[in-house]
């Protein structure tokens, strides 16, 4: 099954907490702080793999998490680093933020590895908080939280040439003839239900890639038929083969066919309509009215579009097109890729920032202190409930501006102040 769009959530590993352990050994009276640092959380890494050609592996599993780092231990032992999460995707996969649609990663080169999210930093053990005044700190740092983001994976096939045209004009037969592709061929509409890639190999190592795009019909850009589901795969191609049934086997006019398909391309994207296009006039072996063919040829000449009469069935006229195409491709620059968004900046934009200090009175008339600074400190440190640790915590909050915020709120001597699980009476 060909799946080219999925929505998943990815999360980097959390860092392990630092340890607040103390050295306790026989004959060592004052062991001192002995807690090791936590291990770093695992990263989320995307890898482009040419052996994969669909996003079906993401159809049923929607949450992907890297491993957390392990906590630090006594004897200053570091926690083990969390294992990185490797996510393999087809070459041509774009990773976009689900909320904003911004491009984060464009996996366009086989084998490239890109870090999407970095794991949280491991927290410091209490040995880092020892100083000349605080010789036995009972405080340690929590591990940093691994970033999490909801993303849309979108596969856009990387081919040099895209085959477009109405259903049953011979696109699949063409790609099978000129490459090793194995597209299904049938005498009914929409025989090809998903894009297929084929490599055209000429002599002396010359080659290029063709994408067989499922047949388009009028109204495709609005979802008619197979709709615009696969039009995006043409966006990265350098040029277009527009295959037309000039024998008009199904009773349609070939000029109208040509105009309608180009109308659909333009409605989907001006970029598609502006791509270099050559017309392959197929089924010349079945044509009965050469006058209509000459009319079509003159019509295209007025527009400056090249036409190549061929019979795919009889293998006539194909070689000339392939060599001409190779020469043309060497002169066409691939369009520059869309600029990627810096993931660090994006995560900051998506984060809802609180005020530094958010202060209210509760139903018991106590002053409750919260806000971004409080959240950050509580998230960052493992704080013991002994007197020394609580004093250290309050000194930390005071240095970060809590007292000024309380005074601005209108705190009075004797007021009860609550911060998380800490409660105290305020005196200036």
Curated annotation (Swiss-Prot):
The main place the protein resides is cytoplasm
Q: Which terms does the UniProt entry file under GO BP?
A: ribosome biogenesis
Residue positions binding Mg(2+) = 172, 192
Give the highest taxon in the source lineage: Bacteria
Domain OCT, chain residue ranges per copy: 349-428
> Where is each OBG-type G domain found?
159-330
Stated EC number for the protein is 3.6.5.-
Keywords carried by this UniProt record = Cytoplasm, GTP-binding, Hydrolase, Magnesium, Metal-binding, Nucleotide-binding
- One Pfam annotation reads GTP1_OBG
**InterPro entries given in the database record:** G_OBG, GTP-bd, GTP-bd_Obg/CgtA, GTP-bd_prot_GTP1/OBG_C_sf, GTP1-OBG_CS, GTP1_OBG_dom, GTP1_OBG_dom_sf, OBG_GTPase
Q: Using the record's annotation, list all stretches that form the Obg domain.
A: 1-158
Which GO molecular function entries does the Swiss-Prot or TrEMBL record give? GTP binding; GTPase activity; magnesium ion binding
Q: Which SUPFAM superfamilies match?
A: Obg GTP-binding protein C-terminal domain, Obg GTP-binding protein N-terminal domain, P-loop containing nucleoside triphosphate hydrolases
**Where found, per UniProt?**
Cytoplasm
Q: Which cofactor does it need?
A: Mg(2+)
- GO cellular component terms, A-Z: cytoplasm
> Where do the annotations place GTP binding?
165-172, 190-194, 212-215, 282-285, 311-313
Biological role stated in the UniProt entry = An essential GTPase which binds GTP, GDP and possibly (p)ppGpp with moderate affinity, with high nucleotide exchange rates and a fairly low GTP hydrolysis rate. Plays a role in control of the cell cycle, stress response, ribosome biogenesis and in those bacteria that undergo differentiation, in morphogenesis control.
Q: Which family does it belong to?
A: Belongs to the TRAFAC class OBG-HflX-like GTPase superfamily. OBG GTPase family.
Q: Which NCBIfam families match?
A: Obg_CgtA, Obg_CgtA_exten, PRK12296.1, PRK12297.1, PRK12299.1
Q: How does it assemble?
A: Monomer.
Name of the featured protein: GTPase Obg
Q: Which organism is it from?
A: Fusobacterium nucleatum subsp. nucleatum (strain ATCC 25586 / DSM 15643 / BCRC 10681 / CIP 101130 / JCM 8532 / KCTC 2640 / LMG 13131 / VPI 4355)
């Amino acid at each position: 099954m060909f799946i080219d769009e999925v929505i998943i959530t990815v999360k980097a590993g959390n860092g392990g907490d630092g340890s607040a352990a103390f050295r306790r050994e026989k004959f060592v009276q004052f062991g001192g702080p002995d807690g090791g640092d936590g291990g770093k959380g695992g990263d989320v890494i995307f890898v482009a793999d040419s052996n994969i050609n669909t996003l079906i592996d993401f159809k049923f599993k929607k949450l992907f998490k890297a491993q957390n780092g392990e906590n630090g231990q006594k004897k200053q032992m570091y926690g083990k680093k969390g294992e990185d999460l490797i996510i393999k995707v087809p070459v041509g996969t774009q990773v976009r933020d689900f909320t904003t649609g911004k491009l984060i990663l464009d996996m366009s080169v086989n084998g490239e590895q890109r870090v999407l999210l970095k794991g949280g930093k491991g927290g410091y053990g209490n040995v880092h908080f020892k100083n000349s005044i605080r010789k036995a700190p009972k405080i340690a740092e929590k591990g940093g939280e691994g970033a999490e983001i909801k993303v849309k994976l979108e596969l856009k096939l990387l081919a040099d040439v895209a085959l477009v045209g109405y259903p049953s004009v011979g696109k699949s037969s063409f790609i099978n003839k000129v490459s090793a592709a194995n597209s299904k061929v049938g005498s009914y509409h929409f025989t090809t239900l998903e894009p297929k890639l084929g490599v055209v190999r000429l002599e002396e190592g010359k080659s290029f890639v063709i994408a067989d795009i499922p047949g388009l019909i009028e109204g495709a850009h609005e979802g008619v038929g197979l709709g615009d589901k696969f039009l995006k795969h043409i966006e990265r191609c350098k040029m277009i083969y527009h295959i037309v049934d000039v024998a008009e086997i199904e009773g349609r006019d070939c000029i109208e066919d040509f105009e309608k398909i180009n109308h659909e391309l333009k409605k989907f994207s001006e970029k598609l309509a502006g791509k270099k296009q050559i017309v392959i006039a197929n089924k010349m072996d079945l044509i009965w009215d050469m006058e209509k063919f000459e009319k079509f040829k003159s019509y295209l000449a007025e527009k400056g579009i090249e036409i190549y009469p061929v019979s795919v069935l009889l293998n006539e006229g194909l070689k000339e097109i392939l060599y001409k195409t190779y020469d043309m491709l060497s002169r066409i620059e691939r369009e520059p890729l869309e600029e990627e968004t810096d993931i660090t900046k994006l995560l900051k934009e998506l984060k809802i920032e609180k005020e530094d200090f958010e202060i209210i009175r509760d139903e018991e008339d106590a002053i409750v202190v919260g806000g971004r600074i409080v959240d950050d400190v509580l998230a960052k440190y493992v704080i013991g409930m002994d007197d020394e640790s609580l004093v250290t915590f309050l000194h930390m909050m005071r240095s970060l501006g809590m007292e000024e915020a309380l005074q601005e709120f209108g705190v009075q001597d004797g007021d009860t102040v609550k911060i998380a699980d800490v409660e105290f009476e305020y005196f200036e």
